[in-house]
Amino acid sequence: MRIIFSALILILSFSTVFAQRGVPEVREDVPLDSIRLSDPAILADEETQTYYMTGTGGLLWESKDLRTWTGPFKVAETDPGSWMGPDPMIWAAELHQYQGKYYYFATFTNRDVVIDTVKGNTIHRRASHVLVSDKPDGPYVPMEDDVYLPPDIPTLDGTFWVDKDGKPYMIYCGEWLMNWNGTMEKIELKPDLSGSVGEGKVLFRASDSPWSRERDEDGNSIPNKVTDGPWLFETQTGKLGMLWTSWVFSDYVQGVAYSESGTLDGPWIHEEEPITPPNFGHGMLFRTFEGKLLMAVHSHKSEDGRYIRIPHLFEVDDSGDRLVVIGPYQP
């Protein structure tokens, strides 16, 4: 009896550890609007004819038709001895296929390391980073360099683009918490994406946008300070654009900017009005296996002090010089 009791305690101990680590229960045939996920990004993988959806939380969902999904699966494997620590928060993960491999761009936060305190806000060690895998469903593991961006500045929401010079780049946000005017920046990556080259360059600032607004202490309307969720695209006419998200007072909203030079260096000209309805944002674009261009975003609402975010799809048209949102898409 004592042996059985000891074995039971051991099993319960392992169960507690797994529960604390947040090992997810895999579910099948889950409708898209039943999934709670911030920053959804979908890779349509031609080889497997499968859609892979990532986002905040370091988890992955799989679907054959965009209607129902299987998951979530844990696919990100980080180095506990790196700056991320043993249990980093993972935000805004994206999958990109490049030169025969799959890359996992995401934001990692080490809550045990504080780099600064500004205006009463504690700023933790946070940065965009890249993992790699030979398969779209992972596992995604670290590469050569464990630091892509400066450790003393919080960065987030890194995405991927190959510019007209043929070089790969990470485009990311300099978080507003430190300078109260968030930035959009680029940094060159090594040819195999295993690290960065040189220093980052500011492309534009949150205050450059005509549509994102907030109120100061006196209630005056001023430019919003947040930059969030960049995604690069090129229209069928060759126009380089960037989706990005901020706020219009209390609404979470997505806008778009276009590069006059057709390169990452811009200058970036912002559209006067947001491209999506209020409280839809952090979007990205992908084509279905049938060739339809879709935008994945999450809806945003606050409920009892918590954010509720659900993935949604919009059909879009890129046949002209400007991206046009047609409307909600139901698979």
Question: Model-derived features: where do they sit?
Answer:
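Bacterial Sec-dependent N-terminal signal peptides
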Residues: M1-R21
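Carbohydrate-active catalytic/glycan-binding domains of CAZyme proteins
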Residues: A19-P331
